[in-house]
């Protein structure tokens, strides 16, 4: 039996990461999935030891993961990682560098094999009210919920190579996943599926220009994909309060 940990939305919290590393040392999972929104906010300094961290991946995560690998040796888990909508894509080069060092596998829009399963990673979320758009896509069409900012607006830390006015989560999933059975497929998403217990936001009674906001903010495309293709397992992050509300 594969012993797995799934953790998401740590947002650069040193205390939460240290709890995670302690749990890995104690319980020795075979595999760890990190579901995005892993970095500290760009404008918030992170203190560690006696100094301030200026690059969270290279100065903290790589250091702690190397120490963990040295300690656990053969018991060091396989680690699969995606970024999230609050992670600046300008930091992606450091995620790739950590992959090259063998500390984790960065799997956004990739498929990898592990223990008889095919693992897929996908970081994009539907449009949000937030300004950073590195990891946002139109969902199934160019419709945007009231109060949300389209992916064509806001700002990006890295120029997109896609036509963001036409790209959708639905098209991405069609391209990423080949036809056929997904009974041994595992998906690491940042976005939750729409209208489920995982995408319930604390928006009760909130309006925008007099229009009540939908309390469900997940992806229609991801929900349809799960219902139609029936993968073995999907993991999701993004909406912090959903577990408390539901």
Segment roles from a protein language model:
Residues 1-5, 111-121, 182-185, 246:
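Beta-strand-turn-beta hairpins that frame and shape the catalytic cleft
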Residues 39, 49-61, 183-230:
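Active-site-proximal segments of metal-dependent phosphoesterases and phosphodiesterases across multiple
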Residues 66-79, 103, 176-184, 224-232:
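A structural motif corresponding to the C-terminal end of an alpha-helix
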């Amino acid at each position: 039996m594969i012993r797995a940990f799934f953790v998401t939305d740590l947002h650069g919290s040193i205390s939460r990461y240290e709890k995670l590393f302690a749990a890995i040392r104690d319980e020795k999972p075979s595999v760890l999935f990190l579901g995005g929104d892993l970095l500290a906010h760009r404008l918030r300094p992170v203190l560690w030891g006696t100094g301030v961290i200026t690059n969270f991946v290279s100065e903290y995560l790589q250091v702690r993961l190397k120490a963990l690998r040295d300690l656990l040796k053969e018991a060091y888990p396989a680690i699969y990682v995606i970024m999230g909508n609050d992670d600046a894509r300008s930091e992606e080069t450091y995620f790739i560098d950590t992959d090259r060092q063998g500390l984790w596998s960065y799997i956004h829009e990739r498929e990898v094999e592990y223990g008889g399963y095919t693992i897929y990673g996908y970081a994009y979320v539907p449009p949000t009210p937030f300004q950073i758009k590195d990891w946002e896509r139109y969902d199934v069409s160019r419709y945007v919920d009231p109060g949300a900012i389209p992916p064509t607006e806001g700002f990006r830390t890295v120029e997109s190579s896609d036509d963001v006015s036409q790209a959708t989560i639905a098209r991405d999933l069609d391209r990423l996943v080949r036809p056929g059975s997904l009974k041994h497929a595992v998906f690491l998403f940042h976005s939750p599926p729409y209208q489920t217990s995982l995408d319930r936001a604390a928006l009760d009674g909130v309006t925008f220009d007099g229009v009540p906001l939908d309390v469900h903010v997940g992806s229609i495309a991801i929900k349809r994909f799960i219902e139609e293709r029936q993968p073995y397992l999907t993991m999701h992050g993004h909406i912090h309060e959903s577990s408390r509300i539901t």
